[in-house]
Design a protein with these regions (language model features):
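Helix-rich terminal scaffold detector
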Residues: 1, 10-13, 20-22, 90-126
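Residue-level detector of anion-binding/catalytic polar loops
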Residues: 25, 80, 106
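Compact, glycine-rich, soluble single-domain proteins
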Residues: 5, 11-77, 89
C-alpha cells in the first residue's frame, strides 16, 4: 500500500492534491470536517487505498507540575494541542512558548508527528 506523509495542517483539508512517496500525484476528496490521523487508510478519487503518515513537524514539548493550568491557558488561545501522558505538544510559536515558560513549564523544541486533540465536537475518523 502506498503511503502519503502529511503535516497536520494538510491532514485537516477535505480536498487535497498531494504527492505519494513514489512521486505520483493523488487527489483526495473527504467529508468536510474530517481530520486524517497517522495510520488512517483513505481512498483516493481514482479508488486506490493510501495509508496516511503523520509527518514530523517542529513542535514545542511542554511538561509541568501544573500541566492542567498550562493546558487551560493554551485552550483559551484556541490552538491545537496534543495531550499525552504528562506532556502537551503544540506547533512552534514563540509567544506561546513564552506563556508556558511564564507559567513555570519546561519547554523543549522537538520534531515529531503532531496529533492534536479533535475537540469536544471533532470528527473521529476510524
Amino acid at each position: 500500500m502506498e503511503r502519503l506523509e502529511l503535516p497536520f495542517e494538510l491532514r485537516q483539508k477535505s480536498r487535497l492534491r498531494a504527492r505519494l512517496a513514489s512521486g505520483e500525484e493523488v487527489r483526495l476528496m473527504l467529508a468536510r470536517g474530517t481530520v486524517m490521523r497517522g495510520g488512517d487508510v483513505v481512498t483516493t478519487i481514482d479508488g486506490r487505498e493510501v495509508e496516511i503518515v503523520a509527518a514530523k513537524e517542529k513542535l514545542l514539548h511542554i511538561e509541568s507540575d501544573h500541566l492542567a493550568r498550562v493546558a487551560y491557558h493554551l485552550g483559551n488561545r484556541h490552538v491545537p494541542v496534543q495531550v499525552g501522558h504528562g506532556f502537551l505538544r503544540i506547533a512552534e510559536d514563540h509567544v506561546l512558548e513564552d506563556l508556558a515558560l511564564q507559567l513555570g513549564a519546561r519547554v523543549s523544541h522537538i520534531q515529531a508527528p503532531f496529533e492534536p486533540e479533535a475537540g469536544a465536537y471533532g470528527h473521529h475518523h476510524e
